């Protein structure tokens, strides 16, 4: 599902108001379900999950839910198994494990969602890790780099010289 489609006359077109409204409705309902329900999946035990965005398909039958476990590290989500380097293992508590846990609970969550929201169809849910948190952290670290700060100061000095 594309975030932006192309319209021949006006260029890029984003999601419709209806898609945005339905996505927010589902996001709020899922947050309430995750907060109130006792989820039995071991991957979600003791972990708070943030649902940052829900993107709806044009027909509102599919929802992509972007999630981030609170307190998740930026460390790799998978590791190579020492005994078999070609086999990967999901790191406990990692975003990949949380997404896998939510995916296993999709049927349960969809059933609870059907009772909570008033829509003609309850959408199929797909969970993905939200990379924007990691991107923001990376940008913060990048701006703290002394070399980058030096370049920013140099550019601001050049801009001041051109003005005055």
UniProtKB/Swiss-Prot annotation:
PANTHER family: RIBOSOME-BINDING FACTOR A, CHLOROPLASTIC-RELATED (PTHR33515:SF1)
Family, as annotated: Belongs to the RbfA family.
Function: One of several proteins that assist in the late maturation steps of the functional core of the 30S ribosomal subunit. Associates with free 30S ribosomal subunits (but not with 30S subunits that are part of 70S ribosomes or polysomes). Required for efficient processing of 16S rRNA. May interact with the 5'-terminal helix region of 16S rRNA.
InterPro entries, alphabetized: KH_dom-like_a/b, RbfA, RbfA_dom_sf, Ribosome-bd_factorA_CS
Protein name, as recorded: Ribosome-binding factor A
GO cellular component: cytosol
GO MF annotation, one: ribosomal small subunit binding
Alphabetized NCBIfam families for the sequence: PRK00521.2-5
This protein's UniProt keywords: Cytoplasm, Ribosome biogenesis
Entry keyword annotation includes Cytoplasm: yes
Gene3D superfamilies, alphabetized: 3.30.300.20
GO annotation (BP), single: maturation of SSU-rRNA
Keyword Kinase: no
Signal peptide, first to last residue: none
Subcellular location: Cytoplasm
Subunit description: Monomer. Binds 30S ribosomal subunits, but not 50S ribosomal subunits or 70S ribosomes.
């Amino acid at each position: 599902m594309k975030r932006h489609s192309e319209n021949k006359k006006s260029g890029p077109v984003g999601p419709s108001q209806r898609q945005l409204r339905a996505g927010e409705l589902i996001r709020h309902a899922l947050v309430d379900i995750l907060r109130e329900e006792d989820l039995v999946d071991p991957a979600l035990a003791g972990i708070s999950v943030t649902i940052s965005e829900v993107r709806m398909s044009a027909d509102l039958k599919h929802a992509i839910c972007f999630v981030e476990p609170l307190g998740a590290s930026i460390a790799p989500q998978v590791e190579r198994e020492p005994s078999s380097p070609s086999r990967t293992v999901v790191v406990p508590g990692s975003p990949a494990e949380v997404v896998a846990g939510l995916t296993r609970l999709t049927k349960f969550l969809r059933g609870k969602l059907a009772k909570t929201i008033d829509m003609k169809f309850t959408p199929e849910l797909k969970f993905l890790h939200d990379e924007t948190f990691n991107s923001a952290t990376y940008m913060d670290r990048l701006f703290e780099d002394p070399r980058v700060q030096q370049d920013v100061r140099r550019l601001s000095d050049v801009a001041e010289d051109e003005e005055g």
